[in-house]
Amino acid sequence: RSTHCISSAASDVYKRQLLTGTPDRIKGKDNKIDYYNASMFLKPDGSTKMYYKIHLVPFAESIPFSNYFSFLKKLNFGQANFTAGSEYTIFNLDGISFANLICYESSIPKIARKFINLGANFITIETNDSWCGHSSGVYQHFEIAKLRAVENRVPIARSANTGISGLILPTGKVNNKIPFNEQKVTLSSIPIKNVQSFYTEYGDWFAVICTLISLITLFFGWLQKRS
């Protein structure tokens, strides 16, 4: 809880609301301790609200299917063995709702869509990209965040410990971009628009229908060729 204390003190001293990443642990059933990759939203009055990462990185943060096959828990690849969260938490900033994606979650479209449908007006992303080094992964991860902004027509504020950071507008344009491996503080005004995109409302149905039409067309083409 030392991270919690430091972050809470910073929020209290500067009288600002603060969003930060932190590990957390909770005693669960049978006194078992569950560890989480979390984000914490603090207010100057000392109150906090937590979001626990729902989709963990396979083999880095957890072993897939280990809850169903106990022998998998004995495998050790140096993973963190976090417990996946289950609640899509919405934060409130002076009457404006927002949600936070943790690292790898920004690569999964349905998570961002779920948050927007729950009322989030914008999205933040906290990410540790240091594991990529100075590779193409850093830039690819940032470009993926642009897709989430355009898909849902919402602004995204992205903060990476080694960069790339910046404010991504609903059009995909980036404001106040901080390059890789550059220490900098930037202030951005986040435009709030309550416009629901086609993808936010209908999800992947368009892609599913197109796929089905393609498969049906191929099937009848194959039948015609055989006859």
Predicted segments, located by residue:
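Single conserved hydrophobic/aromatic residue that forms the stacking wall/gate
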Residues: 2-10, 14
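C-terminal beta-strand edge segments of enzyme domains
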Residues: 63, 142, 148-227
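Catalytic-core segment of enzymes that process non-peptidic bonds
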Residues: 11-97, 152-183
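Short beta-strands and strand-loop turn motifs
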Residues: 1, 21, 125-128
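Active-site beta-loop-alpha substructure in enzyme catalytic cores
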Residues: 73-146
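A short, polar/proline- and glycine-enriched secondary-structure boundary/capping micro-motif
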Residues: 30-31, 59-63, 109-113, 135, ...
